[in-house]
């Protein structure tokens, strides 16, 4: 079952991206390196509820 999640920048705490993930294959929280337009840099984005 795929669920929609939000990714939050770890530097400035802005929620920049939404994506989907399969909870069966990825039971933990996602961490992706994405571009943050507020920081003007690539930063780690963590999954939030």
From Swiss-Prot:
Single GO BP term: translation
Family designation: Belongs to the bacterial ribosomal protein bL33 family.
Highest taxon above the source species: Bacteria
Organism: Carboxydothermus hydrogenoformans (strain ATCC BAA-161 / DSM 6008 / Z-2901)
Protein name stated in the entry: Large ribosomal subunit protein bL33
Gene Ontology annotations for the cellular component aspect, listed alphabetically: cytoplasm; ribonucleoprotein complex; ribosome
Gene that encodes the chain: rpmG
UniProt GO MF annotations: structural constituent of ribosome
Keywords: Ribonucleoprotein, Ribosomal protein
């Amino acid at each position: 079952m795929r669920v929609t999640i939000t990714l939050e920048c770890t530097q400035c705490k802005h929620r920049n991206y939404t994506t989907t993930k399969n909870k069966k294959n990825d039971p933990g929280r996602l961490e992706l390196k994405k571009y943050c337009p507020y920081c003007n840099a690539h930063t780690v984005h963590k999954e939030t509820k």
